[in-house]
Amino acid sequence: MAFKIASSPHVTRNLHTSTVMQRVILCLLPGLVVQCAFFGWGTLVQVLLAILVALSCEAAVMKLRNRNIKASLSDNSAMLTAILIGVAIPPLAPWWMIVMGTAFAIVIVKHLYGGLGHNLFNPAMAAYVLLLVSFPVQMTTWIAPSTVALHSPSLVESLQLIFNVGAHVNMEQFRLGIDGMTMATPLDTLKTDLSMGLTTTESLTKAIFDGSTGVGWFWVNLAYLAGGLVLLKLKAIRWHISTGVLLGLFVASSIGFLLSPDTQASPLMHLFSGATMLAAFFIATDPVTAATSSRGRIIFGALIGVLVYIIRTKGGYPDAFAFAVLLANLCAPFIDYYVRPRTYGHSTS
């Protein structure tokens, strides 16, 4: 056995919860900036509104529980949950949806089970699923990316649509591409086209696609990937879950694409469309709701990746990370039970 020799002092520094959350939030910023660049001010408005609601709900619940409000707010967990919800929903969704989703995430999913460290499910993804199931039309109404949009909303127009003021502003005018066609997300467009009998190659000729990836979404995912790599460098997360998610999705989509390239999206499109990189580095890596052992984390991540591919190709929703993460959260105790590290000094038999 080889032993690594290092000079003193042998001092390690423990990261506090607030520090970890701060690092995650900072690493989210590149993706948020790029997302705002392609989809307008609405994303930033949703994030700020979600933060306001999350902090208010956190303080109210702490007050009811006779807990330290300042300590709870300063751990930044509520703010991180709010940001994840804000970037996940369409930028021009009505204000009451982000309020409802954020309040549900903080009050019900997080605190009903005991607060930080005790929740069974990822709060942001549970809130997303609640909104998606309850309001499917609003949750799947994305505007066209700025590079191919016929009209891009200004800050004032975004506020008017989100808060439903100003009768002259219409959502549909911001969903039109430069070809005059109403646009959806790349995954939604491809799924609709395949159901109508078009091939993948024929679908990729539309303006929403740029080669084998979606316009705008490739750069959004690339920005979240960059932030995720920095997060790994800072040791705020471990590599196992992210690697498992990306490998699981890549292997499953590669098999599907090799078997039927005319009816399946390429692995590159799966990896750089939708919420892939956001989920792989910032959502699935939630230590509270994930598996605990190193091997268990890889299995946990791979399960998410495979579930995403199955739901994207066979399910009713074009993107599937919220459902995949929640299903994997359910499986985390099962994974921990059967994938336990061997105790030092004990045999495996």
Swiss-Prot record:
It comes from the Bacteria. Belongs to the NqrB/RnfD family. The chain crosses the membrane at residues 20-42, 77-99, 124-144, 212-232, 239-259, 265-285, 291-311, 315-335. Part of a membrane-bound complex that couples electron transfer with translocation of ions across the membrane. Its cofactor is FMN. Its main location: membrane. InterPro entries: NqrB/RnfD (IPR004338), RnfD_bac (IPR011303). GO terms for biological process: electron transport chain; transmembrane transport. The complex is composed of six subunits: RnfA, RnfB, RnfC, RnfD, RnfE and RnfG. Pfam families: NQR2_RnfD_RnfE. GO terms for cellular component: plasma membrane. It is a multi-pass membrane protein. Coiled coil: none annotated. Its EC number is 7.-.-.-. It is an enzyme of class 7 (translocase). It is found in: Cell inner membrane. Keywords: Cell inner membrane, Cell membrane, Electron transport, Flavoprotein, FMN, Membrane, Phosphoprotein, Translocase, Transmembrane, Transmembrane helix, Transport. This is Ion-translocating oxidoreductase complex subunit D. The modification FMN phosphoryl threonine is found at residue 185.
